[in-house]
């Protein structure tokens, strides 16, 4: 579950919104505005920096209201394992229900965070894609270094498989076998697999 080789889009242009506060207008970036409604958006590679921001947002929402639901929207190719696990552990620590939504794609650590939401509150949009696989890791250095790195990768692999098995209710052996290669699923297939609970179908507009 290493970071993807795909180029990462730059987030240099952050939209701002104008809000009427009753004491005049106030400008804020879109992510801060979403946070007011307890919405967190993970739309990039999951790095240490991204994880630190998401963890800080989660802790802030816990302090603000420890019982009210949090909503996490995910459109990510994945990222660093330890970064994703930092977010995962914080999600489990919060105590409140966490709704997760896949929009676009949730791959690798993105898929793990998607399925880590509160059971019954894990969603995907109809055209989203979900992918699971085993952690990647290049090894190098002395023979001792290689042995230690290989051992760490195996430990992470076992830990991630256990998390996924617990979240999906799939047998551990099936998770291990399916994720030996990139294993892609549609939203409906992800529901059948147990990664999510519902496929969100937009309501048709009536005229």
From Swiss-Prot:
GO molecular function: ATP-dependent peptidase activity; ATPase binding; serine-type endopeptidase activity
One GO BP annotation of this record: protein quality control for misfolded or incompletely synthesized proteins
Subcellular location: Cytoplasm
Keyword Protease: yes
Catalytic residues identified in the record: 108, 133
EC number: 3.4.21.92
Keywords tagged on the record: Cytoplasm, Hydrolase, Protease, Serine protease
Keyword Hydrolase (UniProt): yes
Subunit comment: Fourteen ClpP subunits assemble into 2 heptameric rings which stack back to back to give a disk-like structure with a central cavity, resembling the structure of eukaryotic proteasomes.
NCBIfam families assigned to the protein according to its UniProt record, in alphabetical order: PRK00277.1, PRK12553.1
Name the record gives this protein: ATP-dependent Clp protease proteolytic subunit 2
């Amino acid at each position: 579950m290493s970071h993807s080789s795909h180029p990462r889009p730059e987030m240099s242009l952050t939209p701002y919104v104008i809000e009427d506060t009753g004491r005049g207008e106030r400008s804020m970036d879109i992510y801060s505005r979403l946070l007011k409604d307890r919405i967190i958006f993970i739309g990039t590679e999951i790095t240490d920096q991204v994880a630190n921001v998401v963890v800080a947002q989660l802790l802030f929402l816990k302090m603000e209201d420890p019982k009210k639901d949090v909503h996490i929207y995910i459109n990510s190719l994945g990222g660093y394992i330890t970064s994703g696990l930092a977010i995962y552990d914080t999600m489990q620590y919060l105590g409140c229900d966490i709704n997760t939504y896949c929009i676009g794609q949730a791959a690798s650590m993105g898929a793990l965070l998607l399925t880590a939401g509160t059971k019954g509150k894990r969603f995907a949009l109809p055209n989203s894609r979900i992918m699971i696989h085993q952690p990647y890791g290049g090894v190098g250095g002395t023979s001792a270094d290689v042995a230690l790195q290989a051992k760490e990768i195996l430990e992470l692999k076992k830990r991630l498989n256990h998390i996924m098995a617990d979240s999906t209710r799939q047998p551990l052996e099936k998770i291990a076998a399916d994720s030996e290669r990139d294993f892609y699923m549609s939203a409906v297939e992800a529901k059948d697999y147990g990664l999510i609970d519902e496929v969100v179908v937009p309501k048709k507009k009536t005229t």
